[in-house]
Each structure stands twice: as structure tokens, then as C-alpha cells.
Amino acid sequence: MSIIKEFKEFAVKGNVMDLAVGVIIGGAFSKIVDSVVKDLIMPVIGVLTGGLDFSNKFVLLGTIPPSFKGNPDSFKDLQAAGVAAFGYGSFITVAINFVILAFIIFLMVKFINKLRKPEEAAPAATPEDVVLLREIRDSLKQR
């Protein structure tokens, strides 16, 4: 079998195509969740915490060089200048993104599982002793 033929068989199998569709939809869906967190949830949390902006929460680990021209209270400016800073606010935002995304995926899987019809279990195999007893019975009937 040629490599191209093997690749075609591999690429068109149901699982590979399902995975490709899932990755594409997941990428688009993560942008929606990111926007929900950044544009809807974090501003509400900011209002509830007195205007706290999580994106600029950081701990300075190094010194700011004298040639630094940006805002020393801006995590992005410090990062761009190569100043060592621990950006825990950005991590909090990403963690909230993850929790929301995981919860939505959980709900989707739960919903899909409800829609699926439960597969009927195959009848249990007849025990060997019962089969043997039936054979003996049938043999006795024939005499």
C-alpha cells in the first residue's frame, strides 16, 4: 500500500475528521470565552472590588532600568522592556477562562449524553451448566 493511499485512509477516518472539527470549533469557542471573561466578567469583578484591574496585577521581581520609558505600573510595558515581573493578574484571568470553558464543555457533554439513546445491553450468555442441562433434556426426549 502506498504512503498516499494510507494517508487518505487515515485522514478520512471518522475520528480524525471529528478531531479536526473539534479543534477548529474549540479555537473559535475559546475566543468567545476569552471575550466573555475580559469584557463581561472581569469588569463586574473590578466594580465589586473597587475598580481593581486584574490585568495589571503583578509583583516586580527585578529592578526597572533607568532607561525605561513606559509606565512602571503597566505589566505589559514592563514585560516589553524585559523587566522581570510575576504577572499573577493575568494568571487569574486565564484561570477564570479555563474554569468557564471547562464548565461549558461539561454541560455540552452532559447534554449530548442525554440526547444519545442508551444502547441496549446484549443479552447475557447462557451459562454453560444450563446449556449442558438442555442438551441432556433434549437427548432424553429423543429416546
UniProtKB/Swiss-Prot annotation:
Q: Give the highest taxon in the source lineage.
A: Bacteria
Please give, as recorded in its UniProt entry, the membrane topology of this protein. Multi-pass membrane protein
Q: Does the keyword Cytoplasm apply?
A: no
State where the protein is found: Cell inner membrane
For this record, an example GO cellular component is: plasma membrane
- Work out whether the entry's keyword set contains Membrane: yes
**Record keywords:** Cell inner membrane, Cell membrane, Ion channel, Ion transport, Membrane, Transmembrane, Transmembrane helix, Transport
Instruction: Mention one GO molecular function.
Output: mechanosensitive monoatomic ion channel activity
| One of the Pfam families matching this protein, by short name | MscL
Query: Which positions, given as ranges, span the membrane?
Result: 10-30, 89-109
Primary localization = membrane
Per its UniProt record, what InterPro entries does this chain match?
Mechanosensitive_channel_CS, MS_channel, MSC/AndL, MscL_channel
Subunit details for this protein? Homopentamer.
State its role: Channel that opens in response to stretch forces in the membrane lipid bilayer. May participate in the regulation of osmotic pressure changes within the cell.
The text of the family note is: Belongs to the MscL family.
Q: What is this protein called?
A: Large-conductance mechanosensitive channel
